[in-house]
């Protein structure tokens, strides 16, 4: 990651924020998340990257500020959107809201969200009662019925896909 960052890949800072946080360095985690996502959130209000970073790694007050910012953006009739919003909601411990945001913002790049959703960090989201409906609305059920489900996903007795 450091090599990627030194070669100019700015969002490597976001990935480095996870490591800093795991090492207990909250201040560095906040700075790296903010630096690594700022360019990905350029259509959000100024300072959004820092507010969201503080919410992810900071205290309850910082988390509530970040959630309020995201709520304000998503409440707009045509949100100034970024794929970082669903990922941020997942990181803020709001998986149900993250799923909802993905469905509300279908035309944005949510690849970062989906990478995290299918990792161990997406376990809470995959366990939600609304997850099967999310899969249906995303068109995944139709594809999985045709081509087979991914590893760790199976149909339950009700016919819904359940993913570990």
Residue ranges and their predicted role:
Residues 1-164:
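Alpha-helical protein-protein interaction modules
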């Amino acid at each position: 990651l450091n090599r990627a960052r030194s070669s100019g890949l700015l969002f490597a800072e976001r990935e480095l924020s996870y490591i800093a946080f795991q090492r207990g360095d909250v201040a560095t985690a906040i700075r790296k998340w903010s630096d690594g996502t700022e360019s990905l959130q350029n259509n959000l209000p100024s300072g959004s990257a820092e507010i969201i970073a503080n919410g992810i790694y900071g205290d309850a007050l910082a988390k509530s500020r970040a959630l309020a910012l995201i709520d304000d953006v998503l409440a707009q009739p045509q949100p100034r959107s970024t794929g970082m919003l669903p990922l941020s909601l997942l990181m803020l411990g709001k998986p149900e809201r993250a799923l909802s945001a993905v469905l509300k913002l279908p035309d944005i790049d949510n690849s970062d969200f989906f990478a995290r959703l299918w990792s161990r960090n997406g376990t809470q989201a995959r366990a939600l009662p609304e997850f099967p409906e999310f899969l249906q609305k995303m068109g995944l059920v139709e594809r999985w019925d045709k081509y087979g489900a991914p590893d760790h996903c199976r149909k339950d007795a009700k016919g819904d896909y359940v993913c570990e």
